Each structure stands twice: as structure tokens, then as C-alpha cells.
């Protein structure tokens, strides 16, 4: 495997971001790392989140010789990026909720952010709103249950629409015309979300913007992705997880996504160098 793009998330949500990156860079190699032993991240204390993510990602970068890291998790991106960039010597890309494009797109100037409780309460999120959506009424909806519903859907192919409708009731009542999906798990539920909310609500996520950023960094940095080394059929795909075991359904989903290797990784001590 050549220097891969390493995509990281707490669970399978980052696959939505990985899919967008692969559209732009289909011949590159990829490592997908999901810390499902600590899922969902939205309920972790900030210091625990930072130390665990930095330790795990650093370990995988050293092992795989990744050329860039994509933190495909909104909750982690709000707090982990400074420490991770200080630790690593390769580009690190995070996820920014699509507040700015939502504010520009909204005709009613009533927009919403659907994210984990951790993302909703972070100062970073409120700064984004103040900076880019000051002319809008912004409703914030924090929900970790949707993360687990997305995980369940990927693992089993099933999703409880009745429960989803209950969860989204406040969103429906808010009378929005644009809803930002502020968790990378939520695009996995896009069809069901649209079904409940109706076509009058536009759903926005950050996947395409992240892919563009990765492409730009690789093309203009030392790790050039656009060369003959990558002009081959397909790419090598490896996945790593932290939980003791994963379901057969999830393993099948990952295989269907193109992952040829699936391996559990034991995290090192967060204080180790």
C-alpha cells in the first residue's frame, strides 16, 4: 500500500465522507479507522475525546504511513484538531458544519443544525453561527440517538421510521427551509430524513467540501495524488476498528464498500509518544 488517505470517525458515519473523497480521488489508497468502542462521541467528556483520538490516530498514521488525515467526525473536529495538528507532521482536515452555505441558500432565513449534543454545545459551533448566519434564525437540535440509528441501519438494513418521526418532531415544528446535517452519520439517513421532513426542507452536509479540500491539499503539497503511481484500476482499502467485535452485517457492508482488510486495533496509552 502506498501512502493512504486516512479517514477517521467514531463509527460508520465517516463512510459518507470517504465516498465523496473517492469520487474525486478514485485511484488513491484508503485507510478507514472507526473508534466504535467509544461510540457515540457526543456523550464523551472533552479531554477524554481529545486524548483518545490523538493517541489512536497517531498510532495508525505511524503504522500506515498515511499522507493526510481526515477527521470525518463533527464532534471530534470541534475539539481535537489543534492537538492532532501539533502531534502530526502531515495535513489534517476536519469537518465544518455547513452553516455558511445553509445561510446563503435559505430563502426564509430559518435554518437548523442537527448534530450530536457535543457539537451543538461547543463554542466553535456558536462562533460559526455568529460569523456566517447572523441574519438567520438558527435552531439547534442535539441528538445522539440518530447516530446509533444510523449504525443500526448499516449493520441490519433496518430503521424505525416511527421513532425517527418522533425524534424529528421539533425539527418539523421549527418550520425550516434548510437543515444542516452536522454529524457525518446523518447522511446515511438522508432518504429517511427527507421522507419525514418533506421536500420543502433542503438537507446539507459537508462531504463534497471536505473532498475538495483533500484534493487541493494533496495536489499542492508534497504528497501529490495526481501522478502515474495512482493511475491504476481501483484502490487498496483497509479498515480498522476498536471494539472487541463487529456484526456480520457491518462486516458485509464494509466489504461491499470495497474494503479488502478489516482488523481490530488495540489503542495505545494516550500519554505515549
Curated annotation (Swiss-Prot):
Its EC number is 5.1.1.3. One of its GO terms (molecular function) is glutamate racemase activity. Pathway: Cell wall biogenesis; peptidoglycan biosynthesis. Coiled coil: none annotated. The keyword Cell cycle does not apply. Substrate binds at residues 9-10, 41-42, 74-75, 184-185. GO terms for biological process: cell wall organization; peptidoglycan biosynthetic process; regulation of cell shape. SUPFAM superfamilies: Aspartate/glutamate racemase (SSF53681). Belongs to the aspartate/glutamate racemases family. This is Glutamate racemase. InterPro entries: Asp/Glu/hydantoin_racemase, Asp/Glu_race, Asp/Glu_racemase_AS_1, Asp/Glu_racemase_AS_2, Glu_race. It is an enzyme of class 5 (isomerase). The active site is at 73 (proton donor/acceptor), 183 (proton donor/acceptor). Gene3D superfamilies: 3.40.50.1860. It catalyses: L-glutamate = D-glutamate. Provides the (R)-glutamate required for cell wall biosynthesis. Keywords: Cell shape, Cell wall biogenesis/degradation, Isomerase, Peptidoglycan synthesis.
Amino acid at each position: 500500500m502506498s501512502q493512504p488517505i486516512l479517514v477517521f470517525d467514531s463509527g460508520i458515519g465517516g463512510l459518507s465522507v470517504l465516498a465523496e473523497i473517492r469520487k474525486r480521488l478514485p485511484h488513491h489508497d484508503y485507510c478507514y479507522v472507526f473508534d466504535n468502542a467509544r461510540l457515540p462521541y457526543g456523550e464523551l467528556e472533552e479531554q477524554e475525546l481529545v486524548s483518545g483520538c490523538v493517541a489512536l490516530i497517531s498510532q495508525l498514521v505511524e503504522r500506515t504511513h498515511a499522507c493526510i488525515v481526515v477527521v470525518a467526525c463533527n464532534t471530534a473536529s470541534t475539539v481535537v484538531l489543534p492537538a492532532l495538528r501539533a502531534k502530526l507532521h502531515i495535513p489534517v482536515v476536519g469537518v465544518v458544519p455547513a452553516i455558511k452555505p445553509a445561510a446563503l441558500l435559505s430563502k426564509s432565513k430559518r435554518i437548523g443544525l442537527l448534530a450530536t449534543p457535543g457539537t451543538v454545545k461547543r463554542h466553535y459551533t456558536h462562533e460559526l453561527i455568529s460569523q456566517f448566519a447572523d441574519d438567520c434564525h438558527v435552531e439547534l437540535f442535539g441528538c445522539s440517538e440518530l447516530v446509533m440509528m444510523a449504525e443500526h441501519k448499516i449493520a441490519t438494513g433496518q430503521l424505525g421510521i416511527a421513532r425517527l418521526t418522533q425524534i424529528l418532531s421539533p425539527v418539523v415544528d421549527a418550520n425550516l427551509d434548510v437543515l444542516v446535517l452536522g454529524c457525518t452519520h446523518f447522511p446515511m439517513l438522508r432518504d429517511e430524513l427527507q421522507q419525514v421532513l418533506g421536500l420543502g426542507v433542503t438537507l446539507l452536509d459537508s462531504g463534497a467540501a471536505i473532498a475538495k479540500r483533500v484534493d487541493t491539499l494533496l495536489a499542492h503539497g508534497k504528497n501529490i495524488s495526481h501522478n502515474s503511481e495512482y493511475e491504476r484500476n481501483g484502490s487498496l482499502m483497509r479498515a480498522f476498528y476498536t471494539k472487541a467485535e463487529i456484526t456480520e452485517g457491518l462486516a458485509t457492508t464494509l466489504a461491499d464498500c470495497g474494503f479488502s482488510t478489516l482488523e481490530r486495533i488495540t489503542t495505545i496509552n494516550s500519554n505515549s509518544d
